[in-house]
Amino acid sequence: PLDGRIKTKRPDTPEGPGGEVEMRLSTLPTAFGEKMVMRIFDPLAAVKTVEQLGFGAAESQRWAELISRPHGIILVTGPTGSGKTTTLYATLKSLATDEVNVCTIEDPIEMIEPAFNQTQVHTAIDMGFAEGLRALMRQDPDIIMVGEIRDLATAEMAIQAALTGHLVFSTLHTNDSAAAITRLADLGVPSYLIAATVIGVLAQRLARTLCPACKVRDEDTDRDALDELSKPWRMSGGVRPYKAVGCLSDCLYSSEQHVQGTGREMTT
């Protein structure tokens, strides 16, 4: 098995020069030959602002209040590909100023952001998350982002950073916000330290939305069935169904250009 990354450039267009695109590659030998998976990252499209994440007004307000806290641990949870890193990057970018030292330890560095001091995990030289976090503590950080809390050593270093007055962001692979507490306890973190340092958890998913440039009203929908289905949510003004069409200019006929974040927050 091999992992690697390739950087290339999009073709120039009449609107301007093509930007840089990064491709993340993973290969695996199988019974029928080499299998390859490629993930394409557009740095300009990936780094969003907090307002572009797609959360509702109430969730955005609670998140803004949470990240304004001076110290503690804030966790973002969800399955692989649910937008955890994008949320963290957008949040850190909103907090990074000339007076704020934002440091990250990642594996791998998903997107290069000049506003952060980013460090790559290197297991070959015995620098994992815990070792990298220990080194970051001597770099006078104000805000720290740990790519993922995978073991007790990393959790202990994150807790130590929070107890010494730092704001720490990290991710966990759990299905909901409450399970993040259970996950930390399973790693061996004492409950009193969890209560003293974890100030909030955001459980996140991605929901596809239709391309706003080409979607059209669906007049063939069974209104009675739709009203019955949407009754528990008490939507004001009723539900207006749309259907996918596809266009060349915005969604390249995929009909699903936009992906919107949904989240459930738990604060302490």
What is the meaning of each model-derived region?
Residues 78, 107, 263:
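Active-site glycine-centered loops adjacent to acidic/histidine catalytic or metal-binding residues
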Residues 174-268:
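Cys/His-rich Zn2+-binding cysteine-cluster or related metal-binding knuckle/ribbon modules and their
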Residues 64-67, 71-74, 85-208:
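Switch/coupling sub-region of P-loop NTPases
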Residues 40, 52, 123, 204, ...:
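Active-site donor-binding loop signature of nucleotide-sugar glycosyltransferases
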Residues 2, 19, 24, 32-34, ...:
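A generic structural signal for well-ordered coil/turn residues at beta-strand boundaries
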Residues 1-82, 87:
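N-terminal "pre-motor" subdomain/linker immediately upstream of P-loop NTPase catalytic cores
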Residues 15-17, 30, 42, 68, ...:
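A generic structural signal for short, solvent-exposed coil/turn residues
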